[in-house]
UniProtKB/Swiss-Prot annotation:
Transmembrane segments annotated in the record for this chain: 15-40, 47-66, 76-98, 105-124, 128-150
Keyword Nucleus: no
One Pfam family of this chain: DUF4386
Lineage top rank: taxon: Archaea
Source organism (scientific name): Archaeoglobus fulgidus (strain ATCC 49558 / DSM 4304 / JCM 9628 / NBRC 100126 / VC-16)
GO terms under cellular component: plasma membrane
Protein name (Swiss-Prot/TrEMBL): Uncharacterized protein AF_2041
Lineage of the species this protein comes from: Archaea, Methanobacteriati, Methanobacteriota, Archaeoglobi, Archaeoglobales
Membrane topology of the entry: Multi-pass membrane protein
Keywords assigned by UniProt, alphabetized: Cell membrane, Membrane, Transmembrane, Transmembrane helix
Localization annotation: Cell membrane
Amino acid sequence: MSVLAIIFLLNLKPTIYSIVGIFLIIILDVTVAVALYFLLRPVSKNISMLMSLFRIVYAAIFTTALYKIHDLTAFYSILDLGYIFFGIHLFLLGFLVYKSGYMPKWLGALIFIASTGYIIDPLLRFSGYAVEIGMYTFFGEVLFAFWLVIKGRKLSEVVSTP
């Protein structure tokens, strides 16, 4: 094997790991979408379904963006479109959490605030502005994940009702 071939393979390995990691994230996104549907179905079956579909569409757009990974401008443009769908998912998730009665209202409000960053940032980038508000609005999303890990086990009685 030539030295150039070895260098090529060594440089390719991190790229392959990155792509595999991204596909795992996409699979987890779809899994989370389904789990959130069942978790929030008691609040509103239709809105819960719509919320989950927006997350699945985001995952599909993310997958599509991978085909443009060689062209970073196109990749990020496609990803920005996906972020808008993810933001709408968070908007609906925040609404459902707020209305649930079995999750804290403040958490729903923070998720709603997080949705604004995912919706507004890409729209501003498409308009030519480089403003990042998402780096300040993501806390609701992170706190929701922690809340589910810490308190979510106790929700099994609520979710088990069809």
